[in-house]
A protein has these predicted regions:
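PLD/PLD-like phosphodiesterase catalytic module centered on the HKD motif
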Residues: 1-195
Length: 195
């Protein structure tokens, strides 16, 4: 029995972004019969059109990323879905597939992701889930909700990785100065790279 959840931070009907939802896009799919799963994380704007393929013009101005991870098993997909449901509350594409047998399991976070009407809690939340791919590559999934109120890179990613970070972020305001809230690791928001 397989299922797939297509999610995005934009509303699939009107294309508007809801500010309280996580800036997150992708596909989380799993097969309980074979105990397998994959996670496609991507940054391309807009939901893909149903039944066809097109790359949005809005995605051509900036670089886009796509990363597909074959997960170790379906339980990893369940843990990732639980974090997504709690922290990011993505919009779920109507073309997602959840079998009837699973929709009766209302405590399964993979099914809860389909219940797009559930309001995100106001309790501040950040979470880190270490996991392995099927090929034994180690990953960490880090997430926060809108109520957390701290800087994602300076207060979660840098301290979790115990390292300085050079990041390129989506800028709507002037470039912030380097941050060092833990007095150990510095986060610098880059403007460009010379090769």
């Amino acid at each position: 029995m397989w299922a797939g959840v297509f999610y995005n931070d934009e509303d699939p009907i009107n294309g508007k972004v809801v500010g309280s939802r996580g800036h997150t896009k992708g596909v989380l799919a799993f097969d309980l019969g074979t105990n397998s799963a994959f996670w496609l994380i991507q940054s391309t704007p807009n939901f893909p059109p149903a039944g066809s393929y097109s790359f949005p013009k809005s995605g051509m101005a900036n670089a886009q990323t796509l990363l597909c991870i074959t997960l170790q098993d379906a339980s990893v997909a369940q843990a990732l879905a639980k974090q997504m449901f709690a922290a990011q509350q993505p919009n779920v594409y109507l073309a997602s597939r959840i079998p009837v047998d699973l929709t009766n399991q209302t405590n399964d976070p993979r099914v809860l992701l389909m219940q797009d009407h559930v309001a995100q809690g106001n309790t501040p939340l950040s979470a880190v889930i270490p996991f392995f791919s099927k090929g034994r590559t180690k990953f960490m999934c880090m997430a926060k909700n809108a109520s957390w109120g701290l800087d994602f890179y300076n207060d979660l990613v840098g301290p979790t990785l115990h390292d300085d970070l050079d990041v390129e972020t989506w800028e709507h305001d002037p470039t912030p100065p380097p941050l060092d809230s833990d007095k150990i690791h510095t986060v610098v928001d880059m403007k460009g790279i010379n090769l």
